[in-house]
Amino acid sequence: MKKSLFLLVFALLLSGCSLLPSAPTPPTTMQLTNSKISVLTPSPEITNTITPIPMAEKITATIHTSEGDMIVNLFPDKAPNTVANFVGLAKGTKDWTDPKTGQKVSGKPLYSNVIFHRVIEDFMIQGGDPLGTGTGGPGYKFADEQVDEKYLRGTIAMANSGANTNGSQFFIVHRDYPLPNLYTIFGRIDASDTASLAVLDKIATTSTAPGDKPIKDMVIKSIDIVEE
């Protein structure tokens, strides 16, 4: 009788174990309006307020990549905080936190030698993550800016994981795309700049592995900023 009771209890315990839920998945998925497209950008722990700084009326960013250069005309009049953040991280004049070490970084450009970690032909190319995985950032976040522009070919905008969670990740639109106004637009490649658009095409059409990561690294070597 005791043996039968023990076996019954043991069987119940085993069946109970099978009902234990699996570990929860961290909420890191960010949708770009299309359910087939998601990028990973966890919410940073530190909230950063971008202090507006005097900027030139015309600012261009030359993104030097392993595939060639793309010249982007920034919009300091329409998205001053976002442009100030991008320029500071590109030049190394803005402090950020290295997600690999947790250490504060000063005087070093964040974008140098960072890859475009997610590429979707006819949609966009995304980069700006120091980890190169889609889960990294500068260790802070800042608010969206409402910009009355469309996501046309060559447009550069901030990636985010929800409202007011901008950091360092950005994307460049490959083809005109009907996105809602949820991602701060802060610049664009000139439609007549065929050389820059050819580089965009080359990166956007590269072969990718599952998860939309290029098989061959598409590297941002550095970003030069010119203010006029």
Q: What residue spans do the PLM features occupy?
A:
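Sec-dependent N-terminal signal peptides of Gram-positive bacterial secreted proteins and lipoproteins
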Residues: 1-24
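Cyclophilin-like peptidyl-prolyl cis-trans isomerases
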Residues: 17-228
